Amino acid sequence: MTISMLQSKIHRATVTDANLNYVGSITIDEELIKKAGMLEFQKVDILDINNGERFSTYIIKGKKGEICLNGAAARKVCIGDLVIIVSYAQMSTDEALNFKPKIVHVNSKNEALE
């Protein structure tokens, strides 16, 4: 049996853009993706601190400091909103007991603090 556990999160990132006319996804600074141990095209949940929205999408690589919600997800955020970007992993209970998720805290410019 496997359970779904928090794999990593990018905590309190600032939305820099919302592009309704793009096909879909969230564009994330490539360096933040690496620091969080996430992968391009990985499914993630987006938690908007400002309005309480919670939704799923997938990652595409972006430029330094970029956090952009694309397509339909652009309707769920406003530029300047703070979001938490969360990934999960499936693992056995034994693996989960020793697993530590990666937490990446960022400043207002979406630069990693760690």
Swiss-Prot record:
Its cofactor is pyruvate. GO terms for molecular function: aspartate 1-decarboxylase activity. The keyword ATP-binding does not apply. One of its GO terms (biological process) is pantothenate biosynthetic process. Binds 1 pyruvoyl group covalently per subunit. It catalyses: L-aspartate + H(+) = beta-alanine + CO2. GO terms for cellular component: cytosol. It is found in: Cytoplasm. Its EC number is 4.1.1.11. Its main location: cytoplasm. It comes from the Bacteria. Keywords: Autocatalytic cleavage, Cytoplasm, Decarboxylase, Lyase, Pantothenate biosynthesis, Pyruvate, Schiff base, Zymogen. Pathway: Cofactor biosynthesis; (R)-pantothenate biosynthesis; beta-alanine from L-aspartate: step 1/1. The keyword Cytoplasm applies. Pfam families: Asp_decarbox. SUPFAM superfamilies: ADC-like (SSF50692). Catalyzes the pyruvoyl-dependent decarboxylation of aspartate to produce beta-alanine. Heterooctamer of four alpha and four beta subunits. PANTHER family: ASPARTATE 1-DECARBOXYLASE. Belongs to the PanD family. This is Aspartate 1-decarboxylase.
